C-alpha cells in the first residue's frame, strides 16, 4: 500500500487536513502550535484507491523536542510515496519554509505544495508569494471551509499507482485487519486466537509510557522527552512478535484535573475512547516516586472498561523500595485491581521488557477463554454447597445453573429464582471461587444474575 505523508511546520493545518481526508477526527486539532508531536496513520480511499495517510509531527527548529520530531518526520517521508508539504497561507513564506521544502525535494518523490487557510481574496493574493518555491503542483485550500480539497484529492489519486502493494511489514497486517470481525458479536476462542491484540498504555504524565512503547516495539517512533506531557495524540504501533500481532497505543499522559487545559482534556477523552477499544491495559506507575491519588484515579478509569489489566512498575532501576513492599501498597490502594499481575521493568534500560510479552499473551488468553459449561456449574454448585446463599426475608435464593454468554472479559450468567437478592458480597465470593478453579489472572469477571428468559443486559461485576 502506498503512503502519503503530510509535512509542515506546527499549526499549518496538517491534522485538520488529515481528519478531513480520513473522514473522522483521529488527530487532535487546536490553535496551540505543535499539537501533533507524533505521527498518526489512517488507511483511506482516494478516488477509489487505497493508501496509507500519515500525519507527521510539526517541523520547527525552536525547541529540542521538535528537533527530535523533525528527524522522525524526515525519516518517515523518505519511506513514503507522496509528500504533501503544507504552509500557512496567512503568513508570508519564510526561509525555513523553503529550506524544509527543498530538503524534501531531494527525496525525488512526487511532492505538492499545499497552501492552507486561503479564506479570502487577500489570502489568494498572498499565496502568489509561494510561487518562487519552483514547484508545479501548488494547491490553495481552506480545510476549515472545505475548499480546494477535491482538486488536491484528484492530484493524489493521479499519483497513486494501480494495484501496487509494497513489501512493507506493516502492509502485511492490512489484509489481516480487513478480515477482522469487530461487530461486537460473540466470537469463539478460535477467532480470538487469530486476531490482533489491542493494548492501551496508560498512566499519568512522565511515568515512561512512550519509553515503554519504544522498548516494546524496538523502534523510537513515539517522541520521548523529559518534558512532562510530551505525548498528546495517542500513538499506534502495530507489531508482530512470535507470530502474534499486537497494536500498542501510547495514550496521552493524564495530569491532575485542575491542570488539564482544553487540548489535554480532549486527549483525556481520547484516552478513554482508546481504552474502550482495547483488550488489555498496561497501567504504568513510576516506582521511583510515591504513589499518588491521580494514579488511583487513572487505575479507576482503566478499570471501568473491564479490560485485561497488567500493572507495570517502570523506572525500577531508580527505585529504592522493596518489590514486595510496593506490591502490598498497590494491592491495598488498588483493591479493585487485585486480579492484575504486577511486573517491574526499566523501559529506558530495556530491562525485563522481554517478560511483558508472555504476560500479555497469558492475560489475553484468560481474557478471551471459553469456560466449559459443565466445569463452570461444578464450581458454582460446590461453592453454594460450601457456603449457601443467604435467604431473603425467609425465602430461599437459588442458582439453577450458570452459563458463559460472553468473552473479553468472561461474562457469566447466573440463572436464578431471585436474581435481585444476590448480595454483592456473595458475588465476590463466587468470583474468588472461579479464580481459584480457572486461569483468570489479569482479567475481571462479569457475573450477571438473571431470571429464566431474561436478556443479557444489566451486567454486574
From Swiss-Prot:
GTP 1 binds at residues 8-15, 55-59, 116-119. GTP 2 binds at residues 203-210, 250-254, 314-317. It comes from the Bacteria. Keywords: GTP-binding, Nucleotide-binding, Repeat, Ribosome biogenesis. It holds the Pfam family MMR_HSR1. Residues 2-164, 197-368 form the EngA-type G domain. The keyword Nucleotide-binding applies. Residues 369-453 form the KH-like domain. PROSITE patterns: G_ENGA (PS51712). GO terms for molecular function: GTP binding; ribosome binding. HAMAP family: GTPase_Der. GTPase that plays an essential role in the late steps of ribosome biogenesis. This is GTPase Der. It comes from Campylobacter curvus (strain 525.92). The gene is der.
Amino acid at each position: 500500500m502506498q503512503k502519503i505523508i503530510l509535512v509542515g511546520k506546527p499549526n499549518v493545518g496538517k491534522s485538520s487536513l488529515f481528519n478531513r481526508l480520513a473522514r473522522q477526527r483521529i488527530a487532535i486539532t487546536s490553535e496551540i502550535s505543535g499539537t501533533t508531536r507524533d505521527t498518526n496513520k489512517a488507511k483511506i480511499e482516494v478516488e477509489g484507491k487505497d493508501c496509507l495517510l500519515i500525519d507527521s509531527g510539526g517541523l520547527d527548529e525552536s525547541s529540542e523536542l521538535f528537533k527530535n520530531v523533525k528527524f522522525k518526520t524526515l525519516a518517515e517521508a523518505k519511506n513514503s510515496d507522496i509528500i504533501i508539504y503544507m504552509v500557512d497561507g496567512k503568513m508570508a513564506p519564510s526561509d525555513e519554509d523553503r529550506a524544509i521544502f527543498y530538503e524534501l525535494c531531494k527525496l525525488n518523490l512526487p511532492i505538492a505544495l499545499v497552501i492552507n487557510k486561503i479564506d479570502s481574496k487577500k489570502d489568494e493574493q498572498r499565496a502568489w508569494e509561494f510561487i518562487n518555491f519552483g514547484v508545479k503542483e501548488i494547491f490553495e485550500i481552506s480545510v476549515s471551509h472545505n475548499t480546494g480539497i477535491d482538486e488536491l484529492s484528484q492530484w493524489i489519486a493521479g499519483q497513486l499507482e494501480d494495484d501496487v502493494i509494497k513489501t512493507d511489514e506493516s502492509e502485511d497486517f492490512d489484509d489481516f485487519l480487513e478480515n477482522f470481525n469487530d461487530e461486537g458479536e460473540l466470537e469463539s476462542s478460535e477467532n480470538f486466537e487469530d486476531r490482533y491484540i489491542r493494548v492501551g498504555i496508560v498512566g499519568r504524565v512522565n511515568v515512561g509510557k512512550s519509553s515503554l512503547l519504544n522498548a516494546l516495539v524496538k523502534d523510537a517512533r513515539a517522541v520521548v522527552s523529559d518534558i512532562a506531557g510530551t505525548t498528546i495524540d495517542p500513538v499506534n504501533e502495530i507489531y508482530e512478535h512470535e507470530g502474534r500481532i499486537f497494536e500498542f497505543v501510547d495514550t496521552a499522559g493524564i495530569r491532575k484535573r485542575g491542570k488539564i487545559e482544553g487540548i489535554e482534556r480532549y486527549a483525556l477523552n481520547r484516552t478513554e475512547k482508546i481504552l474502550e477499544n482495547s483488550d488489555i491495559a498496561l497501567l504504568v506507575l513510576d516506582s521511583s516516586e510515591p504513589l499518588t491519588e491521580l494514579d488511583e484515579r487513572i487505575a479507576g478509569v482503566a478499570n471501568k472498561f473491564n479490560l485485561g489489566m497488567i500493572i507495570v512498575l517502570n523506572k525500577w532501576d531508580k527505585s529504592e523500595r522493596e518489590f514486595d513492599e510496593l506490591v502490598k501498597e498497590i494491592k491495598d490502594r488498588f483493591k479493585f485491581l487485585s486480579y492484575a499481575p504486577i511486573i517491574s521493568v526499566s523501559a529506558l534500560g530495556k530491562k525485563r521488557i522481554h517478560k511483558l510479552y508472555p504476560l500479555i499473551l497469558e492475560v489475553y488468553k484468560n481474557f478471551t477463554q471459553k469456560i466449559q459449561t459443565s466445569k463452570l456449574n461444578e464450581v458454582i454448585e460446590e461453592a453454594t454447597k460450601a457456603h449457601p446463599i443467604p435467604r431473603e426475608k425467609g425465602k430461599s435464593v437459588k442458582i439453577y445453573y450458570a452459563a458463559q454468554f460472553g468473552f473479553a472479559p468472561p461474562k457469566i450468567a447466573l440463572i436464578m429464582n431471585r436474581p435481585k437478592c444476590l448480595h454483592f458480597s456473595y458475588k465476590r465470593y463466587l468470583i474468588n471461587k472461579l479464580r481459584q478453579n480457572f486461569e483468570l489472572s489479569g482479567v475481571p469477571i462479569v457475573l450477571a444474575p438473571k431470571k429464566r428468559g431474561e436478556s443479557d443486559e444489566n451486567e454486574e461485576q
